[in-house]
Swiss-Prot record:
Listed Gene3D superfamilies: Vaccinia Virus protein VP39
Xref: InterPro entries: SAM-dependent_MTases_sf
Originating species: Acanthamoeba polyphaga mimivirus
Protein name (database record): Uncharacterized protein L16
Organism superkingdom: Viruses
Amino acid sequence: MQESEIQKPKMQEKFKDHLKKYESDEDYISYINRPLGLFNAYINTYVGPDIKTGLALCHGHNHSIEKFKKIKFINYWYLIDGDAYSFPDYICDLTDIKQLEYFPDDFFDCIMSIYCRVVDTDDNLQYFNILDNVKRILKHDGFFISTELERLFFRFMNDDELIRMNNQLIKLTDEDEIKKYINNFNVKLHFGEDTENITEKQKTFIILNHFEFQKNNTIDIKSIILEKIKLVLKRNGYYFVDLIGEYIFFVPIERVTNKKELLKYTNCD
């Protein structure tokens, strides 16, 4: 008997309690339903019954195939996770992002990522290389939803852009307060290293972390962040469609037919 065959029952046993909690814990249910509910709302508002096939790049540990099945119109989901048995009630179709290469062109109506990063965030170029593949396997009228880009967008900006953005954000709060926060930030805990000179990306992370706890200027902060997200998407060949909560909907630029609408949403000076 192979080792994998021995481990499989243990895996299923491991997620027994997870499934029980999923069905009984109200707070937990709302936590995992939120992105799927918004995704469903988006399909109802913008898309309609032509959506049939979806691909989910996500951690199965937080979800259940039954929740995906409740999303309107989509008849079949392909699920990908590094752990084939991460879903308590489904064995993943794919376990390696590279397996996306085997899908034919124009195959999926929608592709989504929930809560987890599509790839290791240490390699931001790889992230968008994967999105290049997404362009290929997405149907001409398909769309992509990302739930992590709002927190990770700054990883795809150069230092000059980050300096300008950081200065914009700092002006929205007490400069002495934010400098103190930056100086007292536990760099070792968050970045795994002790350093006197933090990078611009690290500084951006710290500033955004500071604003997470502030209630003032939220509209101005979101406006700055959204402007930069549009810039990042445009530079990588995508057209921003909508932002609902923390969930960003976008499509490949070459799939957009209304160029006036494209210019309206993607001009970011």
